């Protein structure tokens, strides 16, 4: 079976610019699907993958990944006629009713998020490809599939965290016997990934691009200075979920699109926002350190709760949010898991691969494989200080 997985939501940013003129350029990037890519999977094996941005001389792009698709086909020595399915790593169809509440949302769904919008792009760039061979896979399921099917394991806990999928900010799956069973979803209004990205934006960086800068700044800051703010802002619940009242603040449709109320609250209760180009001061490093500490607290809370609930001792992390060395270190120290696997493609490029792997798994078994990214095992000696030694790692060939 030959499947091309794709990611990206063409026209999302252009739609926002037309619907809400006058925003800051950085505010238009509070959007999904800006990492278009393609991956070719044949009989459950990844053959080739590529980012669309590489072909249009951009850092990131949301445009339909036709150049990446053509590259994948060329590298495999096949044509589009040989492809059994195209799988997209977003599926907004179940939430169509949510976009019928106002005219702008309805138009956003029609022009950007709907199946018909995707089919129009396929027809434009791949004329003649049958629409019945085009499928959608929910975003977090695509992320989970990418991680689970490349882990080499038959059974594990899968935790997906990013700013948001279709409506989720964090999802937990039980992977067993080649199937992904969703056991918990947390909505974007309580997304720790979304809060992390908004704090990065507040400190003068790009949303969904520069979060790594926040993580780097955190190493120089003192988290205690703003710890109380984040302890109040992010509530850990007994059922393994979290609640973030800050993200539930809403005003107009326009304000909701750019998280305006939450950002005003950050400005009033945390620190005055830093504009790009302004000096980075100690106070900004302290904010970053407190946000990082909060993020780690949430990921550990979720992972540990569902480890106890399921009894699973292996965990896979997927999505853009958990790709941090600090998070991995805290999970190792927690001793809730014997081994941790980090998805080698945590961003939306991984969702393209995951969509293809998931669609393949519905009709045939995915071949077992050793992972192509490090396996991080738990510290073998109880009481041994993990700061004094490197983790054991195993690499695939």
Show which residues each predicted segment covers.
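Short acidic/glycine-rich loops and adjacent helix/strand connectors
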Residues: 1-397
């Amino acid at each position: 079976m030959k499947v091309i997985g794709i990611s990206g939501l063409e026209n999302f940013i252009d739609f926002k610019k037309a619907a809400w003129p006058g925003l800051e350029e950085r505010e238009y990037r509070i959007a999904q699907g800006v990492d278009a890519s393609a991956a070719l999977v044949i009989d459950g094996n990844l053959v080739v993958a590529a980012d669309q941005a590489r072909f249009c001389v951009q850092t990131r792009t949301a445009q339909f990944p036709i150049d990446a698709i053509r590259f994948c086909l060329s590298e495999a020595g096949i044509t589009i006629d040989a492809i059994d399915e195209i799988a997209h790593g977003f599926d907004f169809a179940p939430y169509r009713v949510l976009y019928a509440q106002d005219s702008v949302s309805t138009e956003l769904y029609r022009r950007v998020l709907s199946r018909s919008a995707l089919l129009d792009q396929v027809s434009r760039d791949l004329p003649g490809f049958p629409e019945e061979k085009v499928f959608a896979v929910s975003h977090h399921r695509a992320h989970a599939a990418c991680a689970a099917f490349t882990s080499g394991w038959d059974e594990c806990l899968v935790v997906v965290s990013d700013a948001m999928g279709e409506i989720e900010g964090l999802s937990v799956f039980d992977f067993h016997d080649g199937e992904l069973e969703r056991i918990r979803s947390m909505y974007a209004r309580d997304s720790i990934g979304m809060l992390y990205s908004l704090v990065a934006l507040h400190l003068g960086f790009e949303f969904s691009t520069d979060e790594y800068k926040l993580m780097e700044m955190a190493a120089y800051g003192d988290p205690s200075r703003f710890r109380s703010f984040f302890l109040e802002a992010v509530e850990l619940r007994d059922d393994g979920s979290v609640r973030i009242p800050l993200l539930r603040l809403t005003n107009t449709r326009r304000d909701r699109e750019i998280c305006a109320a939450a950002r005003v609250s950050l400005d009033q209760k945390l620190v005055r926002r830093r504009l790009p180009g302004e000096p980075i001061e100690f106070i900004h490093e302290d904010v970053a350190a407190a946000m990082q500490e909060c993020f780690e607290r949430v990921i550990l809370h979720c992972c540990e709760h569902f480890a106890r609930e399921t009894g699973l001792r292996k965990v896979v992390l997927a999505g853009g949010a958990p790709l941090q060395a600090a998070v991995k270190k805290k999970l190792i120290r927690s001793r809730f898991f014997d081994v941790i696997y980090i998805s080698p493609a945590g961003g939306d490029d991984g969702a393209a691969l995951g969509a293809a792997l998931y669609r393949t798994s519905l009709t045939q078994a995915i071949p077992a494989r050793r992972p192509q990214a490090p396996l991080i095992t738990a510290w073998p000696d109880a009481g041994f200080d993990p700061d004094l030694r490197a983790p054991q790692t195993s690499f695939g060939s």
